[in-house]
UniProtKB/Swiss-Prot annotation:
The keyword DNA-binding does not apply. InterPro entries: NAD(P)-bd_dom_sf, SDR_fam. Substrate binds at residue 140. It is an enzyme of class 1 (oxidoreductase). This is Uncharacterized oxidoreductase SH0585. GO terms for molecular function: oxidoreductase activity. NADP(+) binds at residues 10-34. The active site is at 153 (proton acceptor). It comes from Staphylococcus haemolyticus (strain JCSC1435).
Length: 231
C-alpha cells in the first residue's frame, strides 16, 4: 500500500460535504492538506477541527482560471511540490431543460466541467514535470443515469467522466494516476432537500473512504473508477 504521510494534497470544494470529509481523512493520514473553496469562513471553521500544522487555506473559485492557477502556484511556492489533487467542487441544480433556466445551466457547466478543466490545466504540468501525481475527480452515478429533472447535471457529470476516461489513456506510463469517484445520493448541503424515497443517504465519510482507498494502492495499481451506492 502507498504511504500518504507527508504528502501534499489540494482539495477543491473543501468547505463542506465530501470535500470537507476528504480533507479530514487525509489529514488523519498525515497529509499536508490545502483547503480550497469559495467560502473563507467555512474553510477557517473546518481548519479549526484539524491539526493546524498540516493545513493551509487558499480561497479559490474554480470557475476563475486565474484563481485556480494561483492556487497551484501558491502550493508549489509553499511546499515545493504537490502529490494529490482532489476536485470536489461541484454544483447540482435540479430542473428540466424545458424550464429554460439558462443561469442554472451556466453555473453547472462552469463549475462541473470548466472548473475541472482549469484544474487539470494548472496541475497536470506540475505532475508531468515530477513524473508522478494522482488526480481524483468527483463524478456521480448521474453520469450514467438521468431523471426528468437532471438532464443537464447528468450531462456535466458524464462529460467529466469521459474526460477522465480519455485522460487515463493519455497519461499511461507517465506515473500519473487518475480516479473518478461516482457516488450515489450523499447526505450533503447540496442534497438536503432530497428525501431519496425514505432511504438512508451515504455519509460524506463513505466517499472519503473510497478516495483514500484509491490513493493508497501500490504504485503499479491505478483505480480508475469507483462507484459507491447506498444499500
Amino acid at each position: 500500500m502507498t504511504e500518504l504521510n507527508g504528502r501534499v494534497a489540494i482539495i477543491t470544494g473543501a468547505s463542506s460535504g465530501i470535500g470537507a470529509a476528504t480533507a479530514k481523512a487525509l489529514e488523519k493520514q498525515g497529509v499536508k492538506v490545502v483547503l480550497a473553496g469559495r467560502s473563507h469562513d467555512k474553510l477557517n471553521t473546518l481548519a479549526k477541527d484539524m491539526n493546524e500544522d498540516n493545513i493551509h487555506i487558499v480561497p479559490t473559485d474554480v470557475t476563475n482560471q486565474v484563481e485556480v492557477d494561483a492556487l497551484v502556484a501558491k502550493v508549489i511556492d509553499v511546499f515545493g511540490h504537490v502529490d494529490i489533487f482532489v476536485n470536489c467542487a461541484g454544483v447540482m441544480r435540479s430542473s428540466k431543460i424545458t424550464d429554460y433556466q439558462v443561469e442554472s445551466w451556466d453555473s453547472m457547466v462552469d463549475t462541473n466541467i470548466k472548473g475541472l478543466l482549469y484544474s487539470l490545466n494548472a496541475i497536470l504540468p506540475k505532475f508531468e514535470a515530477q513524473g508522478s501525481g494522482h488526480v481524483v475527480n468527483l463524478a456521480s452515478i448521474s453520469a450514467n443515469e438521468v431523471s426528468k429533472e437532471s438532464a443537464l447535471y447528468s450531462a456535466t457529470k458524464s462529460a467529466v467522466l469521459m474526460i477522465f476516461n480519455g485522460l487515463e489513456k493519455e497519461l499511461a506510463k507517465t506515473g500519473i494516476k487518475t480516479t473518478s469517484i461516482l457516488p450515489g445520493m450523499v447526505d450533503t448541503p447540496m442534497t438536503e432537500r432530497s428525501d431519496f424515497g425514505g432511504r438512508k443517504k451515504l455519509d460524506p465519510e463513505n466517499i472519503a473512504d473510497a478516495i483514500i482507498y484509491a490513493l493508497t494502492q501500490p504504485a503499479h495499481v491505478n483505480v480508475n473508477e469507483v462507484t459507491v451506492r447506498p444499500v
